[in-house]
Amino acid sequence: MIRVRRGYIARRRRTKFFLFASTFRGAHSRLTRTTTQQKMRALVSAHRDRGRQKRDFRRLWITRINAVTRENGGSYSRLIHDLYKGQLLLNRKIPAQLAISNGNCLYMISNEIGSANKEIGRSSSE
């Protein structure tokens, strides 16, 4: 019986794996079995760390905002509370960028919002 040569499909599949793993080191980029295992591990790590990256950046932004507001005698929680009361929809990223580039600007915004909220509170109680 004649030996059947395999078609191009398996070779094409392996080529895709090798292209994905071409930057891996050692046998992880050369051997088929370890390449497939490393590809699966890499994809699992990428999926897991996408969520982790969002958490880490949010924590970093909160830390930066808190550092600048505490320098000026405020606190992060008070700033966020004032933002919500003033109906200013800002995510954590924008105030964090303001805190890095110009901390005084963030301080002025927080003071302005705080004073505006106090005036609104007085007028509604009268």
Swiss-Prot record:
Domain of life: Eukaryota
GO biological process, one term: translation
NCBIfam families, per the entry: rplT_bact (TIGR01032)
HAMAP family the record matches: Ribosomal_bL20 (MF_00382)
Family matches, as InterPro entries: Ribosomal_bL20, RIBOSOMAL_L20_CS, Ribosomal_protein_bL20_C
UniProt function note: Binds directly to 23S ribosomal RNA and is necessary for the in vitro assembly process of the 50S ribosomal subunit. It is not involved in the protein synthesizing functions of that subunit.
GO MF assignments: rRNA binding; structural constituent of ribosome
Species of provenance: Illicium oligandrum (Star anise)
Pfam families: Ribosomal_L20
Similarity comment: Belongs to the bacterial ribosomal protein bL20 family.
Main location per the UniProt record: plastid
Name of the protein: Large ribosomal subunit protein bL20c
PANTHER family cross-referenced by the UniProt entry: 39S RIBOSOMAL PROTEIN L20
GO cellular component: chloroplast; ribonucleoprotein complex; ribosome
Stored SUPFAM superfamilies: Ribosomal protein L20
UniProt keyword annotations, A-Z: Chloroplast, Plastid, Ribonucleoprotein, Ribosomal protein, RNA-binding, rRNA-binding
Cellular localization per UniProt: Plastid, Chloroplast
PROSITE patterns: RIBOSOMAL_L20
